[in-house]
Amino acid sequence: MKLVDEAEILVTAGHGGNGCVGFRREKFIPLGGPDGGDGGSGGSVWIVADENVNTLVDFRHERTFKAQRGENGMGRQAYGKGGEDRIIVVPVGTVVINVQTDEVIGDLTRHGDRLLVAKGGKGGLGNMHFKSSVNRAPRQSTTGEEGEERLLKLELRLLADVGLLGFPNAGKSTLIRAVSSATPKVADYPFTTLYPNLGVVSVEAYRSFVIADVPGLIEGAADGAGLGTQFLRHLQRTRLLLHLVDMAPMDGGVDGVSPADQVRTLERELERHDPQLLKKPRWLVLNKADLMFEDEARAAAETIVAELGWTAPWYLVSALGRDGTFPIMKDVMAFFDRQREDELEARNAG
């Protein structure tokens, strides 16, 4: 199934029911007092995260969601029935944004998370509330309040531990195939990956993490070039970025961009889109070593690392041949283990 990761919807809560003007009409009580009941509250609109849903594709066909109106009050002090709530089901990892204010009003990261996005209107008051010493038979009631209405933007952000970052055709899809059971399309042309792919990497029994292969980025991605910013958001939840670089064409690089300049270009795009992305741990993966002699590949890798002044971990691999891929995954697992230990230690200290 193709991932649809953005949608815009209009939600409208139900109006409250109107209050009733009514009077007691009983035998032997000719001048019965007011007994008009209150209107019922309008239904509200809720968004609920469900782990069994994995795309926003249904919102292409249905974009307007309304909750039920509250029923009007009735005589004999009978309250109107409240309107039914409207439940909208979305994938886990959905961010809800108010389009008018651009405010994030909710981030649904766990199965069963619920978010109230439009509150139903209160029911109107019946005339039984307006009886007084000077007005024994009031004909006054109030109408129900209008329900809230909001235009919302839904953004699905993948819940992955590791994000693969790189130019188109850097070998991200090949790497995720090599280390997980995911089977993204792989071919020797840019933008083979048009939708994000998720793979589960198992290092040992009961020890695994999720890795995301997002479509390749190009210069100007922060402005929407190539496949634009729609996939950069998927990197925001990751705990570690693996920056893949096609290091084989040292004589001019990919489309005339050297391997070191590929890294610098994408760093600029990350900073323009979200400076926090550059603060995430990021490891360099120099791919396609199989296209060079072993000594030549090692020397080329060291040249790139020196040119960048790279101080974080780096690896020389052939994703196609799976050479050097397992040590990366083993190191990633160890990195997450250390992270968990540090977090536990910090909680205990607090």
UniProtKB/Swiss-Prot annotation:
Superkingdom of this protein's organism: Bacteria
Disordered: annotated span:
127-146
**Named cofactor requirement(s):** Mg(2+)
Its annotated compartments are: Cytoplasm
EC number in record: 3.6.5.-
> Keyword Metal-binding on this protein?
yes
- What enzyme category does the UniProt record give? hydrolase
Gene Ontology MF: a single term: GTPase activity
Question: Obg domain: which residues?
Answer: 1-159
* GO CC, alphabetical: cytoplasm
UniProt biased composition (Polar residues): 130-143
Q: Give the record's GO biological process terms.
A: ribosome biogenesis
Q: Which residues bind GTP?
A: 166-173, 191-195, 213-216, 287-290, 318-320
List keywords of the entry alphabetically: Cytoplasm, GTP-binding, Hydrolase, Magnesium, Metal-binding, Nucleotide-binding
Q: Which residues form the OBG-type G domain?
A: 160-337
At which positions is Mg(2+) bound?
S173, T193
Family of this protein: Belongs to the TRAFAC class OBG-HflX-like GTPase superfamily. OBG GTPase family.
So what does this one do?
A: An essential GTPase which binds GTP, GDP and possibly (p)ppGpp with moderate affinity, with high nucleotide exchange rates and a fairly low GTP hydrolysis rate. Plays a role in control of the cell cycle, stress response, ribosome biogenesis and in those bacteria that undergo differentiation, in morphogenesis control.
Q: What protein name applies here?
A: GTPase Obg
